[in-house]
Amino acid sequence: MRPLPRVHAFTDAVLLAAPEFGIRAAAIAAGGPAVALHARARGSGGALLASGARRIMALARPPEAAVFVSGRPDLAAALVANGVQLGSDDLTPGDARRVFPHGWIGRSVHSVEEAKAAVDQGADFLVVGSVYDTPSHPERPAVGLSLVTKAAALGRPVIAIGGITPERAAEVRAAGAYGVAAIRALWLAPDPAAATLAMLSPWMGDA
């Protein structure tokens, strides 16, 4: 597998349907192999997710940004995506591996216990959050940087999510995160390309 990207740009159903989606996706994808675009459209049905994932594939390929699909290892396999990210209500990493054998498989976790279970089930990386309070999940209390550190000690790359901004990326890295994930800080930035590079900055020069 190619190296796991450091910056992960998650979509949602609103973003996938937005007229400017293609322009913003191309700007984020310009970050190249250190960037992954995640097709995610929870609650909207499979058609929007599939069409969005195909659009992302077309936009990401020239700069070689990675493409991940959320919750659908079957779609990830059909598109030959680089990875799949699983929520707590999705298949286990082990079951997803049977459908999607050749790419990265991540699992969203919100506690040390969930992180340990995901590792035991074969997750390649952990999406840990919400690290900070975030409008995306106002009902979910922030887990803080301590969970990032504890999850990283389990030996899997940790992607921190939830309230992540370029200004916070350095402290997240210092806590042990391999990389970060965001929605608003990337997709809704005045300059998505610049925001992506700023988010990536703490990891510049890392292998």
Segments from the language model and where they lie:
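A short, flexible beta-alpha/helix-coil linker loop
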Residues: 132-134
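Conserved N-terminal beta1-alpha1 strand-loop-helix module at the mouth
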Residues: 1-86, 90-93, 98-124, 140, ...
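Short, glycine/charged-rich "phosphate-handling" switch motifs in NTP-dependent
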Residues: 178
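A short local structural element in Rossmann-fold oxidoreductases
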Residues: 137
